[in-house]
Amino acid sequence: MTQKWTPFSWESKVALHQPNYLDKSKLMKVLKKLKKLPPLVFAGEVRDLKESLSMCGDGKGFLLQAGDCAESFAEFHPNYIRDTFRVILQMSVILSFASGVPIVKVGRLAGQFAKPRSSPIEKKNDVKLPSYLGDMINGIEFNQNSRKHNPDRMVMAYNQAASTQNLLRAFAYGGYADLSRIQRWNLDFVKKSKQGSKFKLLADRISECLSFMSSCGITSKNVRQLSETNFFISHEALLLPYESAFTRVDSTTGDWYDTSAHMVWIGDRTRQLNGAHVEFCRGISNPIGIKVGPTSDYKELIKVIKRINPNNEKGKIVLIVRMGASKIEKIFPNILRKIKSAKPVSYTHLTLPTK
């Protein structure tokens, strides 16, 4: 019998790659504060993403997920957010024109502050210190004070994520995502880079289409869809106390949502069927990404998918494949066939992380 799910039922499971907070009272104060903070995303937006992912599963859309391996406090700057957003938009226009389907844009942004490590200890010369686990947990500087697991960093991460999401919303709906503007960026890229020359013919065709649309009176001035775009945020749901603090009930449906992101994923190191991360993710209504590596056991993977998506909901599961170009053609097709043949799994998506 499956135990009753709550945002904290994962605490009864083995939780790997979690920080060791020595000051428990401080941790409780931080979590109490986080629970009172506004959500970063809304349930309706999450449902919109799930619907878009469902279209991808039916071959009527394409998922583009891109962003840094990890965000940092030190490199936080509006120009970096703008440039990342801009590149994703440029990629999406090329992909959409070439494929003829809508591109679902998901950034690894506004929350990707924690990373699992192969070893909990880092050694330099004769000094051993806790490994750097991401700015949400400790500092990258190699000294005792920096490497302490500090719960206050969760509040710092939230503040940066909130600022990032606020700017992304402004970019997405404030005119910066105008299709004609994106095309000018692409044309500039074609002219100024060696790599861009490969896309010259495609870029010219897009320009011709935009020119024709303009001659027909179809421009961003009178068609809102040409000046705005949907943009979603995602991160790895690694630090479970943080994720739990932002898991709220949607007043319109009664369902639970992790409001720290539109989509979260489970990493290759935390994908255990009876582990804490799978337990947490099985109860939230967000789309869930699952990392798939070259050593993944498809039988175990099917069990994990069934645990998280027992009702075979469309748009719920996203497979994030990390195998490299030399292995993906040999390994992944067989895994995908096995997964599709399993009754609990009908809708999966493939996304390739970029840096």
What are these regions (language model features)?
Residues 2-58:
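N-terminal basic/disordered segments at the start of proteins
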Residues 37-40, 52-55, 63, 79, ...:
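C-terminal accessory/interaction regions of large nucleic acid-associated machines
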Residues 42, 66-67:
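N-terminal signal-anchor module of multipass membrane proteins
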Residues 48-50, 274-277, 304, 333-335:
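Glycine-rich, charged/polar anion/phosphate-binding loops
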Residues 70-71, 75-324:
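Active-site-facing alpha/beta catalytic cores
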Residues 318-319, 325-345:
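Non-transmembrane, aqueous-exposed alpha-helical and coiled segments at domain scale
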Residues 348-354:
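Conserved small/polar residues in nucleotide/adenosyl-binding loops
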